[in-house]
């Protein structure tokens, strides 16, 4: 890796570190926070579903911002939107706001996150290629995931401990402060490199054009299409499980106010993410095809969730949680690399946002569905149901594998891609949340 690529990597890791610390202050306590505000299980997960619906609604428009105005602008808008909507969450908790207010602000939170989804990853990939980096993207993205895991570990443990020492609202205020700081950091360090925004005076036309391009390079590209069709099941389950584990583990532990235990659960996921990021390049070398890693990860993850559904021992549940997180974390950089190697630079942010949209759309349905299941049958049963839903993703991943795309075997960064993956004359195999 040359000096220019190292600088790009350092900026990427810095942004990842700060943003993840900000987000993870509340990850371990978010569901408990909503329940403490007076929401039922169904309402709490419905609020999360409205957050996800916001991501679905704004993925393409914010992708237009990233591709038309620059990834840096998109990132800055994301930090401000998230800071403002997080503060509104704190205010609503204080006044025990009605559900409709939680729904509205949750949509705004979703808007904030869509400014990030696709934009940072697209910025990284284009900047690395511009710098002359020819290595595999799994390595850089794996490091990003390790940094994300460390940040999540620090933030989630701190959030849980601070909540127990003070109250459930303080971690939300800390998140606002860190996001404001990240705005300043990004303003100073993040600049679009290797990418020239194409601005349009007609935003609606730009949205339609970019949406069409994302469909052409996404859903109309068979290897990408099947991975995207798997996303609603795997991503929807992942979102639900992460937040359901908080009250589930507190119930097993026997103390509904042991918020540090909820932070511990998020910390275990974070530590597993570090390990998973480290294992990603190794997992890639162990298998001839990237899709083999994805298929195995989905099957093993589903089995673990089914077992969690029948577990009544706290410490066994923690071990299973760690295994589930490691498996998912090891597969994530491989999936990123696979998808990035199949899409062209100009539409990269939008196609990645569209991919995120597909996953979010599953969360809109899966979260309230499983939340209602938790109300009726308990959290263990809802986790078992989540395992069944996860299995549905496997046939789509198998279908993607059958397309025999060059990116499925790729191990280094490609110079360019057409709709089907390879560059027109030469394809230098390459990789890429």
Name every feature range the model reports, one short phrase each.
Residues 105-149:
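Cytoplasmic helix-loop-helix junction between adjacent transmembrane helices
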Residues 10, 45-47, 57, 239, ...:
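C-terminal transmembrane bundle of multi-pass solute transporters/carriers
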Residues 168, 175, 180-203, 398-409:
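Helix-loop junctions on the cytosolic side of multi-pass membrane transporters
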Residues 17, 85, 96-116, 316-330:
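Hydrophobic core of transmembrane alpha-helices in multi-pass small-molecule transporters
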Residues 1-6, 191-229, 418-421, 425-432:
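Juxtamembrane intracellular "pre-TM" segments in multi-pass secondary transporters
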Residues 2-57, 223-269:
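Helix-loop boundary and gating motifs at the non-cytosolic
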Residues 76, 80-96, 102, 299-312:
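C-terminal ends and interior cores of transmembrane alpha-helices
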């Amino acid at each position: 890796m040359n000096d220019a690529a190292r600088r790009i990597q350092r900026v990427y890791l810095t942004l990842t570190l700060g943003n993840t610390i900000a987000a993870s202050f509340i990850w371990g306590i978010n569901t408990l926070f909503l329940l403490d505000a007076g929401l039922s299980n169904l309402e709490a997960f419905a609020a999360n579903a409205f957050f996800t619906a916001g991501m679905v609604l704004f993925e393409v428009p914010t992708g237009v911002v990233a591709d038309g105005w620059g990834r840096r602008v998109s990132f800055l808008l994301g930090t401000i939107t998230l800071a403002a909507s997080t503060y509104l969450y704190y205010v609503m908790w204080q006044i025990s706001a009605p559900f409709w207010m939680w729904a509205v602000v949750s949509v705004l939170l979703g808007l904030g996150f869509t400014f990030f989804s696709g934009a940072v990853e697209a910025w990284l990939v284009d900047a690395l290629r511009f710098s002359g980096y020819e290595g595999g993207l799994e390595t850089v993205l794996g490091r990003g995931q390790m940094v994300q895991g460390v940040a999540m570990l620090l933030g989630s443990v701190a959030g849980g401990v601070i909540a127990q020492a003070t109250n459930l609202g303080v971690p939300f205020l800390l998140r606002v402060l860190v996001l404001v700081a990240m705005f300043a950091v990004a303003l100073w360090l993040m600049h679009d490199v290797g990418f020239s925004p194409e601005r349009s005076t007609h935003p609606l036309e730009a949205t339609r054009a970019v949406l069409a391009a994302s469909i052409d390079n996404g859903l109309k590209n068979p290897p990408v299409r099947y991975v995207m069709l798997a996303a609603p099941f795997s991503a929807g389950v992942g979102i639900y499980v992460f937040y359901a584990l908080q009250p589930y583990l507190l119930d097993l532990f026997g103390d509904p106010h042991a918020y540090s235990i909820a932070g511990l659960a998020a910390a275990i996921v974070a530590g597993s993410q570090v390990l998973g990021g480290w294992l990603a390049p190794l997992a890639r070398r162990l298998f001839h095809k990237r899709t083999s890693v994805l298929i195995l990860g989905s099957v093993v993850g589903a089995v673990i969730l089914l077992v969690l559904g029948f577990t009544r021992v706290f410490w066994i549940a923690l071990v299973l949680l760690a295994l589930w997180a490691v498996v998912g974390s090891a597969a994530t950089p491989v999936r990123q690399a696979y998808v990035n190697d199949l899409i062209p630079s100009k539409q990269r942010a939008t196609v990645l946002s569209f991919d995120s949209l597909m996953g979010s759309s599953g969360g809109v349905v899966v979260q309230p569905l499983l939340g209602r299941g938790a109300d009726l049958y308990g959290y263990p049963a809802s986790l078992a149901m989540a395992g069944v839903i996860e299995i549905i993703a496997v046939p789509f991943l198998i279908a993607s594998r059958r397309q025999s795309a060059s990116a499925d075997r790729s191990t280094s960064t490609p110079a360019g891609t057409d709709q089907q993956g390879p560059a027109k004359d030469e394809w230098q195999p390459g990789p890429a949340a």
